[in-house]
Amino acid sequence: MKSMALSLAATVRCSIVVTLLAALYGCTPATTQSGSGGIVPPPGDDRAPLEWARSEPYLILVRRSCRTLTLYQYGQWVRTYDKVAFGRVPGAKVQEGDRRTPNGLYRIVGKREHPRWSRFMLIDYPNLSDRDDHRKAVEDGIAVTGPGGEIGIHGTDKERFNELGIDWTLGCVSLMNEDVEELYEFVPDGTLVLIED
């Protein structure tokens, strides 16, 4: 029990240091610099319009390194939520049970109330790109289970973890309950969700 408490204390200290460094130097997700090809604004400029998303009724942009989820309507900024938590293990999702949050472009494919997390919005992970990445990981001997599923955006029963920036989910994106309830009312099934580092 003592080692578990020490481990949690170390995790909290690490999380605080990362949060302070991000605040001092700005968060710079790798995909914003290269992978997304400039389709999203640089960190700290989430209020800038997204020209390519002007035909989308809603778009959710999740930035793991900034610990934010931003909602756009027809390419225009609506709201940015902070206190976001992710899968316990950093890095891109490879297989079921790896406790990682996937990166990529998805759609919300189902919404429901949830007894533990207030609201749950299911995304269409794994998409074709994820399945291809998983196939390659199996061929390379990296993945030994399927790609996984049941990834979504939900509330929290660990509010303090979200507040401290501690990642605790099995791969989902977690918001504070009042935030996920507000988002849930805004976005319909079919909403685009872009998750990046």
Would you name each region that the model predicts?
Residues 31-45:
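Short, low-complexity, disordered segments immediately C-terminal to signal peptides
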Residues 25-26:
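C-terminal motif of bacterial Sec signal peptides marking the signal peptidase cleavage site
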Residues 79-107:
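Electropositive
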Residues 48-52, 100-105, 110-197:
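Exported/periplasmic cell-wall-interacting domains
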Residues 3-16:
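Bacterial N-terminal signal peptides that target proteins for export
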Residues 47-90:
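A structural motif detector for short, solvent-exposed N-terminal "entry" segments of globular domains
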Residues 69-72, 80, 91-94, 116-119, ...:
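Short, solvent-exposed loop/turn elements at domain surfaces
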